[in-house]
Amino acid sequence: MIGMALTAIISTMLIMVLLVVAGTFTWVERRVLGFVQERLGPNRVGPFGFLQWVADTVKILTKEDRPPPGADRVAYILAPMVAATPVLAGFGVVAFGDGLALANIDVGVMFLLGMMGLTVYGVVLGALASHSRFALMGGLRAAAQMLGYEAFLGLSLLGVVMIAGSLSLTEIVHAQRDVWFVLLQPFGAALFCIAGVAAAHRLPFDLPESENDLVAGYLTEYTGMSFGLFFLGEYLAVLLVASLAVTLFFGGWLGPVWLGPYLPGPIWFGLKVGVIALIFIWIRATLPRPRYDQLVRFAWKIALPLALANLLLTGLIVVARSAP
């Protein structure tokens, strides 16, 4: 009983920290976008506009949240929860340091892939429940996009699993004490980051909510707290993808050999996640949005064959090295 209560307390604290980190990430993104676009960005609320995300949160919470006419009320309300909850659950198995994971399970990689794949159900459910043609088109795009990118997302990780010999995130980090897997799996790391951006519906892969042709896609009819949950889920998904990339390819909480002992593991982990997240922001600020057919063609005709080739080559090398 005491153990369950302690787990509940730690889980609540982790969720609160994630909410603050996600809010801070929105501020960082807006400041970076302002710098890239040669403007100031948020600079009024708090020092350097840091409290802008707090003001935005209050604004979202105080807005009316009412389903549109003809919408399925139950599905409309449940959809944002279905989209955000798996992302929060995914952080439960992320190892922020040696022994610093809410749940250290042996199949952490599979669990995270499953949680990332579940988010699309919330998007599709919200699109179908909104009773809007723009939302419906956005939901269909999200489903087709996830089918294409989820395939090589999983394949890009199998090379790491082969080298580490484990599906446990902690064991994978321990296997990188001598060399980070990004040096052994550069193609796998690149493919994973591409698929991760697509799974989080971020530019240039935000076709499900493309403002140019779908108003706001599956978010068209959402306001208030429901919109806020979708928004929160998207930014947490970016941080989850960055955390998984750091864990699998960049040594997790392990620092470089010549600097590792001078900083605690969680600090190294946070710094690496921050760098990956900044790269995702840079991608959003600089790359154009492709056409939908180009997006799907890239997934099935370029990325998937490359992921299969990388997996085959890794398998051959692992077998050759293990042969007597």
From Swiss-Prot:
Gene Ontology CC: plasma membrane
EC number: 7.1.1.-
InterPro entries: NADH_UbQ_OxRdtase_su1/FPO, NADH_UbQ_OxRdtase_su1_CS
Topology versus the membrane: Multi-pass membrane protein
Record's keyword terms, sorted: Cell inner membrane, Cell membrane, Membrane, NAD, Quinone, Translocase, Transmembrane, Transmembrane helix, Ubiquinone
GO biological process annotation, one example: aerobic respiration
Catalysed conversion reaction: a quinone + NADH + 5 H(+)(in) = a quinol + NAD(+) + 4 H(+)(out)
Segments passing through the bilayer: 1-21, 77-97, 109-129, 147-167, 179-199, 214-234, 238-258, 263-283, 298-318
Domain of life where this protein originates: Bacteria
Compartments, record wording: Cell inner membrane
GO molecular function: NADH dehydrogenase activity; oxidoreductase activity, acting on NAD(P)H, quinone or similar compound as acceptor; quinone binding
Pfam families linked to this entry: NADHdh
HAMAP family tied to this protein: NDH1_NuoH (MF_01350)
Binding partners and assembly: NDH-1 is composed of 14 different subunits. Subunits NuoA, H, J, K, L, M, N constitute the membrane sector of the complex.
Protein's job: NDH-1 shuttles electrons from NADH, via FMN and iron-sulfur (Fe-S) centers, to quinones in the respiratory chain. The immediate electron acceptor for the enzyme in this species is believed to be ubiquinone. Couples the redox reaction to proton translocation (for every two electrons transferred, four hydrogen ions are translocated across the cytoplasmic membrane), and thus conserves the redox energy in a proton gradient. This subunit may bind ubiquinone.
Protein family according to the UniProt entry: Belongs to the complex I subunit 1 family.
Protein name: NADH-quinone oxidoreductase subunit H 2
Highest classification ranks of the organism: Bacteria, Pseudomonadati, Pseudomonadota, Alphaproteobacteria, Hyphomicrobiales
